[in-house]
A protein has these predicted regions:
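Conserved beta-strand-loop-alpha-helix junction that forms the acyl-donor binding cleft
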Residues: 23-26, 116
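Short glycine-/small-residue motifs
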Residues: 131-134
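Conserved active-site tyrosine of GNAT-family acetyltransferases
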Residues: 29, 33-34, 101, 126-129
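Vicinal oxygen chelate
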Residues: 2-18, 40-91, 95-125, 136-139
Length: 139
């Protein structure tokens, strides 16, 4: 892209996204994401704590405490409303990740399956009802 005086103007490049998950208890959520899903706590903020972030590799999930339900009833599970979507690079990795979460006793909304478009996916249900999609590429 060029500007009037022949200057080149760089277009901003979006490099990542961070999902914000609504939770009831920041400590319980951090414990779930670290103990069950292999994330680490990047930070917890507030007194009492109401905001935090967990990370694993290049994935970041923000956790925000809310005092009342954000969604009505079981609409998230009924309508399969995802709170976050995380990807891995290979079919071997998605299978390995699924098996490690299964061994850790993680509750699944959907077990590992091949989607009609070829991707391999599974969905984890966290203690607050957030649906976290994990996806790998087609074969």
């Amino acid at each position: 892209m060029t500007h009037e005086a022949g200057q080149t103007v760089l277009c901003p490049v979006l490099s990542s996204t961070e999902a914000q998950l609504f939770v009831a208890d920041i400590k319980a959520s951090c414990d779930f994401y670290t103990d069950k899903l292999g994330f680490t706590v990047a930070f917890v903020y507030g007194d009492p704590p109401y905001y935090g972030q967990v990370t694993r590799d290049h994935a970041r999930l923000n956790l925000r405490v809310v005092g009342e339900p954000v969604f009505v009833g079981d609409i998230r599970e009924r309508e399969h409303l995802l709170s976050a979507s995380l990807t891995v690079a290979s079919t071997d990795e998605i299978k390995q990740l699924f098996l490690s979460y299964q061994a850790a006793g993680v509750r699944f909304h959907q077990t590992l399956k091949k989607e009609p478009w070829g991707a391999r996916t599974f969905i984890v249900l966290d203690p607050d009802g957030n649906l976290i999609l994990f996806a790998g590429p087609a074969d």
